[in-house]
Design a protein with these regions (language model features):
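Short, low-complexity, charge-dense intrinsically disordered segments
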Residues: 3-9
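Conserved N-terminal phosphate-binding loop of PLP-dependent enzymes in the Aspartate aminotransferase
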Residues: 14-363
Length: 363
């Protein structure tokens, strides 16, 4: 007689950390893997109740802190009314129109048409398409050490070959110039559809351009009929010390890129231009650019509430004062250099080992 023995394997329950490491797509071989369960104001709390001061802010997303009641109430109300109904640009949706009106009321008159996206990199992609469509040119100029997102088009203009090389071939006809270089502006010609620049280079380590260089860039673009696209996805919404960083340079871009803090903690991006430029998407072909979740009603409601709070509480007016406080207290022989603009900070250490020690101590 043959006996059949059934072997039952009992799976051991995985911890959240194990699920994170095994079932969430990773972006680095050694993630922080902190298990955050709550956030309030400028504080984060892990599963063990340990408190952290959040100096990252979701990478410039949470400009008014975590758990803002005005934002939460706006999200709840809009979720009760309706969430997703149609791609943006086809139906009249109050959350979109109300937020677009608030944004354009606080921008120069030529930045009057808002195309909402679901993220910052999508805003970059949209601006690249719009520039090519409006000018009927193909060349796009960007800057070395820049960062505009990691989708295919945004990656093509990203200013560091280390990040680009593994994903080639990328978009053709991309020109990379040196940031803050007057001589390189001569490379912008009547074949250039647009120049895309961060108003303040963030990922490069808070590189602040000279006022005269920014004005020369604006002048060169005007002379050649090239659209100037300024990326304020990270430095916008007051983090730089003013609501929009470009106002510190006495210039106005043809297209403005927004994201991160735009959604008040919810996923939202936008590119903003004059209506005569934006209307290039309406024909030849129609639906020249569409986006299923761009301008999601709940995200627009959250973003509008966050921007209103930012303005009503006059938070931006305190940014430079807070910058001085940080600069006064950031004192160590290990810090080789500090670069800042408003509440954007970059600290340079002598080597990676010193940098890692600081990170480990903070965690």
């Amino acid at each position: 007689m043959i006996r059949i023995i059934r072997v039952i394997r009992v799976k051991k329950k995985m911890t959240n950390r194990q699920i994170f490491l095994n079932h969430i797509g990773q972006t680095s071989p050694d993630p922080l893997a902190l298990e955050i369960v709550r956030a309030s104001g400028s504080k984060l709390y892990d599963v063990n109740g340990k408190e952290y001061i959040d100096l990252i802010g979701g990478v410039s997303v949470c400009n008014i802190g975590h758990g803002n009641k005005k934002v939460i109430d706006a999200i709840k109300k809009q979720a009760e009314d309706f969430m997703h109904v149609m791609v943006n640009g086809e139906l009249v949706l109050t959350p979109q129109t109300a937020y677009a009106k608030l944004l354009t009321d606080h921008l120069p008159p030529s930045l009057n048409s808002v195309f909402f996206t679901a993220s910052g990199t999508e805003a970059t992609e949209g601006a690249m398409k719009l520039s090519k469509r409006f000018t009927a040119r193909t060349q796009i100029a960007a800057f070395k050490n820049s960062y505009h997102g990691s989708t295919q088009g945004s990656l093509s203009i990203l200013g560091d070959e280390y990040w680009r090389n593994a994903f080639r071939p990328l978009l053709p006809d991309i020109l990379h110039l040196n940031y803050n270089s007057f001589n390189d502006l001569d490379s912008i010609t009547k074949q250039t559809a647009c120049v895309i620049a961060e108003t303040i280079q963030a990922e490069a380590g808070v590189i602040v351009p000279e006022i005269k260089w920014m004005q020369a860039l604006r002048k060169k673009c005007t002379e050649t009929g090239t659209l100037l696209v300024l990326d304020e996805i990270q430095c916008g919404f007051g983090r730089n010390g003013t609501l929009w960083a470009f106002t510190q340079y006495g210039i106005v871009p043809d297209i403005l890129l927004l994201g991160k803090a735009l959604g008040g903690g919810m996923p939202l991006g936008a590119f903003i231009a004059d209506k005569k430029i934006m209307d290039s998407f309406t024909e030849n072909p129609v639906l020249g650019h569409i986006n299923t979740f761009g301008g999601h009603p709940v995200c627009c409601a959250a973003g509008k509430a966050a921007m209103e709070f930012l303005l009503d509480e006059k938070i931006v007016e305190t940014v430079f004062e807070k910058e001085e406080l940080f600069l006064k207290n950031l004192s160590s022989s290990k810090i080789k250099k500090i670069r800042s603009r408003g509440l954007m900070f970059a600290l340079e250490f002598g080597n990676f080992e010193e940098n890692k020690k600081v990170i480990d101590l903070l965690i």
